[in-house]
Structures are given as C-alpha cells and as structure tokens.
Amino acid sequence: MQEMKPIKEGKVREIYDNGDSLIMVATDRISCFDVILNNQVTKKGTVLTQMSKFWFDMTEDILPNHMISVDVKDIPEFFQQEKFDGNSMMCRKLEMLPIECIVRGYITGSGWESYKKTGKVCGIELPEGLKESDKLPEPIYTPSTKAEIGDHDENISYEQSIAHLEKYFPGRGEELAAKLRDNTIALYKKCAEYALSKGIIIADTKFEFGLDKDGNMVIGDEMLTPDSSRFWPAEGYEPGHGQPSFDKQFARDWLKANPDNDWTLPQDIVDKTIGKYLQGYEMLTGKKL
C-alpha cells in the first residue's frame, strides 16, 4: 500500500493529490475563532463529509459541485483504513476563487454586533429596529477574503470583491463577483427552505467556489455543515436574544466564558458539541451515522 501525504492541511481538512482528482479528508479537529483547538471531536469529520454530500446532491440543479464519490471503494487503497471511513471525499480539481461567500438570512453573531453600532452589516444598510436573531427581509451577501491559518478572514464590500477577483482573473472580476453573489443567494434560499421544513433554521452559512478546467463555476470545499453554518432549532425560535444551535456554538460560548482556556475544551463540552452535530444531521437527512 502506497503511503500518501497531504499536499495541504487546513484547520480541519487534509487534501491529498490523487493525480487527476483530490481526496479531501475531514478530520475530527475543531477550530474556533480561527484557532485549531487541542481536542478531537469523534465522528465530526464524518458528519461534515456526509452532510456536504447530502447538500451537493440536492443542489446539482442550481450549480455543479466538485464531488466525485464518497464511496471508499472508489478511492486509493491508502484511504481504505478505518480512520478514513465516512470522512473522505474524492473531488474534481478546481482553481479556487479567493473569496469566502457568506450569506446571512438572520441577524446574529458579528453581524448583530456590527448592526448595533452602525445599523449596517459589512456596509449594507439594514432596516431600523431589528432585534438579535431577527429574520432579515431578504438574505444578504457579505463576502470576505480567505485568510491563511493563524490570520483572520477580512470582511469586504461587494465592490471590493470585484477588485479582489480582478487581481487574480483580469477582465473577469465583475462577472465572477456577480456569479458568486447570485449563486450564493440561490443556494441558500433553496437549502434554507428545505431545512425549515425539517425543523432547522439556517441563520447563515459560507460557500466556496472554484473554476473547472473549462472555466465554469463549481461549488467546492464543504457545503452547509455545522462548521460552515449556524443551524438553529425552529421549535422555540424567538428573536431578541441568541438561539441554541446545532453547531460549535457550545464550544465558542465556553471559550468566550473561559478566556484562560489554552484552547482546550472540557470533555462534556466536546460531547455536547458532537451530540448537536449528529442531531442536526439526523434531522436534515433522516439518517443516523
């Protein structure tokens, strides 16, 4: 069996070169506030991979995605080990676009903090009188730049996203920026409507896109996972305060409340976090992992 080494390690994912494709492995690492924590969260990588597959399958009518297979028999022998079972995806190679495409359907998190101070989120004027966790009249698109590990992503305006893309793709900045915005909002609307029918509010999420060898836009990375999104239970939803969630909010809240934490979570917070990931997956897909 040929040993394979990742060509790229992100906060949570490892990418392996497989010739004309890539193998993307979602590890059980967890990151908060752009820092990789010292804990491993068992089954988290499997939730991320299988949930991405679920959404990729659902949205092919809007935009193609980079997934080739999550079936272990389709990928090299090296990945046919227990630690890769369920958390590995064979993907098409893409030229990734240097923008994180964030869409917000509800006002929460950094968006709420910004709105309280300025009445705006990422430069977008919002109606007066919104309460924390309110649904926005329409989803808003708030792009950011992609940071290297250890740096923070930087929110930018739509106009700045055009200029940023133009640096990498001369003559295509405006066209690509518009496609990123329009696809982001279309994907969010379809998936948020479906999730609500299953009892989950998708408050906000982040997509990443790339270009295939023919220059066509394709969804890359992960899609609508608890790592890239805020999922709230629809039951008991009440604006005016923060909402319980099916993501790593338990971890974020504990870290904020315990600033001298050395980036290590207590085991009960780890257990609650994976419990929420699994519950969200089961509600959305109707399947157990």
Regions found by a protein language model. Name each.
Residues 117-120, 126-175, 219, 223-284:
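Anionic ligand-binding catalytic core segments
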Residues 103, 202-223:
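Conserved metal-phosphate-binding beta-hairpin within the catalytic cores
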Residues 21, 96-98, 198-202, 214-217:
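Coil-to-beta-strand transition motifs
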Residues 171-203:
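A long amphipathic alpha-helix within ATP-dependent nucleotide-binding catalytic cores
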Residues 33, 112-113, 214, 228-230:
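Intrinsically disordered, low-complexity acidic/polar segments
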Residues 1-148, 261-289:
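Active-site loop/lid in soluble adenylation, ligation, and acyl-transfer enzymes
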